[in-house]
Structures are given as structure tokens and as C-alpha cells.
Amino acid sequence: MRNLIISAALVAASLFGMSAQAAEPIESGKQYVELTSAVPVAVPGKIEVIELFWYGCPHCYAFEPTINPWVEKLPSDVNFVRIPAMFGGPWDAHGQLFITLDTMGVEHKVHAAVFEAIQKGGKRLTDKNDMADFVATQGVNKDDFLKTFDSFAVKGKIAQYKELAKKYEVTGVPTMIVNGKYRFDLGSAGGPEKTLQVADQLIDKERAAAKAAK
């Protein structure tokens, strides 16, 4: 019985330690940085969380199994946005691919397959015709894809996202932005799970600030 009590106490202590670790306070300049100038959010009244990524980034691909379940559980006052980082070359090609799929309303159906094809399938997907052939295997109309790919709507989004990346002072991926004010990444946060812990605490910080301002 004594051993059982000790075991239970150890388990409780362990759980408490994990909880305390999860709730460890974050500091500006350590786990995250405050942007020089705040960037307006897309949906006023909601806390915006942005992930900047690149299909050619293995760290972004490895982050997917961690961030996707987290996104699914976000409360209704949080608006999550995925934005492709575009620094030229294949970054721009993959960014245009993502934006095209998003504009067509099929990004959520094809996103994982594109990542898998580039990271594990050996596909480059930097040519629009190769892209069209691939997304067609995922049920996307090839002609509609090519038409949308060169549309003014997509070109406008490309310009918008490139400008946002500059304002966010992004130099690598995956990078996260909370409410247009705070920037952090896997390195500064300490890994995938801790990255989301930082995001959670910054979301709470912004929620509390909004409540206090009312």
C-alpha cells in the first residue's frame, strides 16, 4: 500500500511538474520578439495567428502533425491563417501554387498531398503545368487551376503576402505571428510543442488586453 501511495505521489508530482513547465512564463526577446510596428489583422475583433511556411521546407513539413490538431481546437475568437513565404525561385512557385489552391477553395483538400509530394515523393512542382498535372490527380480541375494560377486575384495575393512578410520581418520558416504584434519560431520557442505553448500564451495575453480595453 505504501508503495502505491508513493507511486501515486510521484505521478502527481510529475504531472504538476509538466503543468508548471507548460505554464512557464514567456518573455519578449527570448521566446518571441515584438514587431517594430504592429500590422493590422485581417478580421477585426478576432485574435489572428499566422503561420508562414514553404512547401520545400522540411521543418514546416515536420511541424504539420503538431500544428494541425492544435488549429482544429482553436476557439472561435481566434482566426488562423496560413501564408506562404516567398523569397524568390521555388519559394515563389510554391507560394503561387498554395495561393491558387486557396483561391479555388480547395487548399484544405490538397495541402497535405502537395507537402507529401514535395517532401517525400521527389516532386519539385515549380512548373505550373507540372502543378496542374499533380493537382488533377487530387481531384482538382486542371483547366480551372491554370486559369486561376495566372489570375489577377492570385497575383494580388502574391504581392500582399510578400509585403506582409516584410512587415513581419520574416527571414525563415516556419514562423508564427500573433495578432500582428509578436513573431516567433521553432528555434526561439524551443521546439514544435513549445512553439504552440508560446502561441497559446500570446493569444491569452491579447484576449486579456482586449477585455481590459472594453
Curated annotation (Swiss-Prot):
<feature type="domain" description="Thioredoxin">
    <location>
        <begin position="23"/>
        <end position="154"/>
    </location>
</feature>
<dbReference type="InterPro" id="IPR001853">
    <property type="entry name" value="DSBA-like_thioredoxin_dom"/>
</dbReference>
<dbReference type="GO" id="GO:0015036">
    <property type="term" value="F:disulfide oxidoreductase activity"/>
</dbReference>
<dbReference type="InterPro" id="IPR036249">
    <property type="entry name" value="Thioredoxin-like_sf"/>
</dbReference>
<dbReference type="Pfam" id="PF01323">
    <property type="entry name" value="DSBA"/>
</dbReference>
<dbReference type="InterPro" id="IPR017937">
    <property type="entry name" value="Thioredoxin_CS"/>
</dbReference>
<keyword id="KW-0574">Periplasm</keyword>
<dbReference type="InterPro" id="IPR050824">
    <property type="entry name" value="Thiol_disulfide_DsbA"/>
</dbReference>
<dbReference type="GO" id="GO:0042597">
    <property type="term" value="C:periplasmic space"/>
</dbReference>
<comment type="similarity">
    <text>Belongs to the thioredoxin family. DsbA subfamily.</text>
</comment>
<keyword id="KW-1015">Disulfide bond</keyword>
<keyword id="KW-0732">Signal</keyword>
<protein>
    <recommendedName>
        <fullName>Thiol:disulfide interchange protein DsbA</fullName>
    </recommendedName>
</protein>
<feature type="disulfide bond" description="Redox-active">
    <location>
        <begin position="57"/>
        <end position="60"/>
    </location>
</feature>
<comment type="function">
    <text>Involved in disulfide-bond formation. Acts by transferring its disulfide bond to other proteins.</text>
</comment>
<dbReference type="InterPro" id="IPR023205">
    <property type="entry name" value="DsbA/DsbL"/>
</dbReference>
<dbReference type="InterPro" id="IPR013766">
    <property type="entry name" value="Thioredoxin_domain"/>
</dbReference>
<keyword id="KW-0676">Redox-active center</keyword>
<feature type="signal peptide">
    <location>
        <begin position="1"/>
        <end position="22"/>
    </location>
</feature>
